[in-house]
């Protein structure tokens, strides 16, 4: 792997190309996943590869998988690249999805099961079986007692499993990565030292998702002297575009994160990302008959169904008219906020007014050249249903990757 690559983690997020944004219907013969599109089928190059977790495909022990039985059979029969229809130039990585079993006493898998999953998937890279450590020491803080004992227990489990994984995967098709865990920069360093002593040439830094950027950077600074020129370092679950240059400087060679996708529909305000690092709030127009909160209010008689249907229709019509330059910003905002007051209340509507006005006034979708924004226009900033929300997430993924490429281009110019 060359510096710095972005892997997109699979979380069963895809879009239906048959979806009609006016009628809000789809092809009745559509087969989920098989007929849908991943980001790499929408954009020429939104990432360098994909990461798949065993926990997502297989579930936890006897637990529920995110894949249907038919999907799992297809996945294992054809391998990951064929299942995801990945182009030849994209790489593949597998991990265990340790955050899904963080509350268990020990990981729910055996090393042999993990290796079998990686080989059947035909990954390029495989991450050793690990166990998340809770917490990271704050400045002036020092873990002790049972908390420290549990941190050390989980670190020991991870390192023992890493040793076993390295030995048993020697003849496998994938390149092994050993996972480092810690509760401060020193303990992370100890993990990395142990992994390198075992013979690992590639390191993944695990458990960093909850950490502040400063904590991540101080840890990377701590381990940098240990890294050789050919040591590969992967940050599990981390993107942080504002720190791309620092990551590269500190020896990181690859990252993975679903944050750009998740923020499209889980963040309160930062839903639509731009290359400059600014973010916009998507305009919420929930389907009155498909939104659980709204449905409850209608069923309980708090909201009149006919009024809800009328205001929802008015809001959507106003947004489409605005995108066609047939309605003013003021009248569009008025229609949107009328529905907002109904489903979120007067107080919330007033709080969100300025954000909506900024989104609609700036029209960021018109300035974007990505395939999503060009094809669906204002729909990309409407917070409504999975098809719109995921497309906004796909846009965010492409923005992240473009920001990464821009950072890399600046470094190339500096070196020349």
Curated annotation (Swiss-Prot):
GO terms for molecular function: glycosyltransferase activity; metal ion binding. GO terms for biological process: tRNA modification. The active site is at 95 (proton acceptor), 256 (nucleophile). Disruption phenotype: Mutant lacking the whole dpd gene cluster does not contain dPreQ0 and 2'-deoxy-7-amido-7-deazaguanosine (dADG) in DNA. DpdA deletion mutant (in a dpdD mutant background) lacks both dPreQ0 and dADG. Zn(2+) binds at residues 368, 370, 373, 395. The keyword Metal-binding applies. Pfam families: TGT (PF01702). Transmembrane segments: none annotated. Keywords: Glycosyltransferase, Metal-binding, Transferase, Zinc. Binds 1 zinc ion per subunit. InterPro entries: DNA-guanine_TGase, TGT-like_sf, tRNA_ribo_trans-like. It is an enzyme of class 2 (transferase). Its EC number is 2.4.2.-. Its cofactor is Zn(2+). It comes from the Bacteria. Part of the dpd cluster involved in the insertion of 7-deazaguanine derivatives in DNA. DpdA may insert 7-cyano-7-deazaguanine (preQ0) into DNA with the help of DpdB. DpdA and dpdB are necessary and sufficient to synthesize 2'-deoxy-7-cyano-7-deazaguanosine (dPreQ0). Belongs to the DNA-guanine transglycosylase family. This is DNA-guanine transglycosylase. It comes from Salmonella montevideo.
